[in-house]
């Protein structure tokens, strides 16, 4: 099958790693994947095409309005591919009634100028099939497709046993804790986590936050009165937290492997809707201990029951100290989760699921 993917590309955000992985495995499975548009030199890993009729299905990967192409490219897509062969993967839960969780919304009218009904009508006008990366869509006219996946070949330091993993992990690392992700609807969770580890942060080692807008609250958020990009620079300074700009997706596994621990946070909205992101899968290929800071039902639905030791306890500081004292059982959990991800969530498995779904 020939699939044409439509989305705005960025090397440090959104679905770039997922799109690249689909492109990699497509040829191995006898399929063809290209990204709609003219060749972009920043993305040598990808094939591009404007020849819409040459493809069987057009798949729109949507986070925000800019993921839809501008005219005349959008017109070319709509004219060149029948609506029955156009699919939307709604990565942010836009195709729902308006939902608010803490400061997080699925319809950010102040930012993108579109109300909830506009999103719903736009999706319905573009495609006959709408998918969301959740096991529990809220609308009857939405299909479940997790989209993101796990790359077992990308594991930074493959090991044969938990004992071997423990020995390698116990060597000196640059960071005690590192989190890679942009400061958008995550500060509440990050702040609680840092407050919990504050008393032992010197024992853990340096802490790093990497992504957009961790140094200070951005001017646009202040001007628009939007709470989702809050941050407390003085608090970060008290813990000697190192902040850095977003990094390309190709550098992510190596960077995370420089840390003992890497928490996995998601937007409150995503936790509420059960939406998954690529970070839930990518973190498990790094040479680090993932701290799975998402709701237990969501975690077990993706990782299986083996993930339980990697879920937070009520006393996060004591939990991390126990891992440091006796890391081998936790590495045993990581290896079992990796096996589960390889079996159920590899990109080969994911693309096979998608092809079967589209061919139905």
Write out the residue ranges for each language-model feature:
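Short acidic/histidine-rich motifs immediately flanking catalytic phosphotransfer sites
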Residues: 50-59, 259-260
């Amino acid at each position: 099958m020939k699939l044409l993917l439509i989305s705005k590309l960025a090397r440090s955000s959104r679905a770039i790693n997922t799109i690249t992985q689909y492109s990699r495995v497509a040829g191995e499975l006898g399929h063809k994947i290209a990204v709609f548009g003219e060749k972009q030199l920043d993305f040598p890993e990808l094939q591009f095409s404007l020849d819409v009729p040459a493809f069987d299905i057009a798949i729109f990967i949507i986070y925000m309005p800019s993921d839809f192409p501008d005219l005349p490219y959008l017109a070319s897509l709509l004219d060149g591919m029948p609506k029955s062969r156009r699919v939307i993967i709604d990565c942010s839960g836009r195709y729902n009634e308006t939902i608010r969780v803490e400061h997080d919304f699925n319809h950010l009218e102040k930012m993108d100028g579109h109300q909830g009904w506009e999103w719903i009508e736009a999706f319905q006008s573009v495609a006959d099939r709408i998918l969301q990366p959740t096991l529990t869509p809220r609308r009857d006219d939405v299909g479940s497709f997790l989209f993101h996946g796990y790359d077992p070949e990308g594991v930074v330091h493959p090991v044969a046993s938990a004992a071997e993993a423990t020995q390698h992990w116990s060597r000196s690392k640059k960071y005690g804790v590192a989190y890679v992700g942009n400061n958008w609807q995550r500060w509440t969770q990050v702040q609680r986590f840092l407050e919990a580890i504050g008393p032992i942060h010197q024992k853990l080692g340096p802490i790093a936050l990497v992504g957009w807008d961790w140094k200070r609250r951005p001017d646009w958020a202040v001007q628009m009165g939007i709470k989702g990009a809050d941050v407390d620079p003085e608090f970060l300074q008290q813990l000697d937290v190192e902040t850095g700009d977003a990094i390309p997706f190709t550098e992510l596994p190596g960077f995370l492997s420089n840390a003992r621990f890497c928490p996995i946070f998601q937007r409150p909205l995503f936790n509420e809707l059960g939406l998954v992101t690529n970070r839930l899968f990518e973190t498990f290929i790094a040479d680090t201990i993932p701290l799975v800071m998402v709701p237990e039902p969501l975690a077990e639905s993706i990782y299986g029951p083996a993930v339980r030791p990697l879920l937070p306890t009520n006393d996060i500081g004591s939990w991390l100290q126990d891992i440091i004292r006796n890391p081998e059982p936790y590495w045993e959990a990581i290896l079992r989760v990796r096996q589960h991800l390889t079996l159920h969530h590899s990109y080969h498995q994911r693309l096979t699921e998608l092809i079967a779904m589209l061919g139905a």
